[in-house]
């Protein structure tokens, strides 16, 4: 795995831990199909959450939370629909798409930010 892949994996590990600490149950990670990948699928009570994780090393780059624009949001919605079609449809509590941004500074602890219902 290259450095970029390792950074992304580290960010996803932190995001999964953050979601679990918030009371969610992570049920799948890095789900792939021909249309793309969903980083994390989790259950939050009766709701199903599709979570995109964006990790950046330094604040000199675009903030991780700014990395999901309209095109990316549309793709996430399409991926969620495909996942639901393959797994029996939406749960009674509904579906939402969340974003976890992870900023890994050169020194100090990483900073995570969780935005619920971004799309």
Curated annotation (Swiss-Prot):
Top-rank taxon:
Bacteria
Recall the GO molecular function terms of this protein's record: nucleic acid binding
Q: Name one Pfam family in it.
A: UPF0102
Checking InterPro entries in the record gives: Restrct_endonuc-II-like (IPR011335), tRNA_endonuc-like_dom_sf (IPR011856), UPF0102_YraN-like (IPR003509)
Sequence similarity? Belongs to the UPF0102 family.
- Quote the protein name from its UniProt record: UPF0102 protein SGR_1878
Native source species: Streptomyces griseus subsp. griseus (strain JCM 4626 / CBS 651.72 / NBRC 13350 / KCC S-0626 / ISP 5235)
């Amino acid at each position: 795995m290259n450095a970029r892949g390792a950074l992304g994996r580290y960010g996803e590990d932190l995001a999964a831990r953050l979601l679990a600490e918030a009371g969610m149950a992570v049920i799948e990670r890095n789900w792939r199909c021909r249309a793309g990948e969903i980083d994390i699928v989790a259950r939050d009570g009766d709701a199903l959450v599709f979570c995109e994780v964006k990790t950046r090393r330094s604040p000199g780059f675009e903030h991780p939370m700014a990395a999901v624009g309209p095109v990316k949001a549309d793709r996430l919605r399409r991926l969620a629909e495909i996942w639901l079609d393959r797994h029996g449809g939406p749960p009674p509590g509904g579906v939402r798409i969340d974003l976890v941004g992870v900023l890994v500074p050169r020194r100090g602890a990483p900073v995570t930010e969780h935005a619920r219902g971004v799309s």
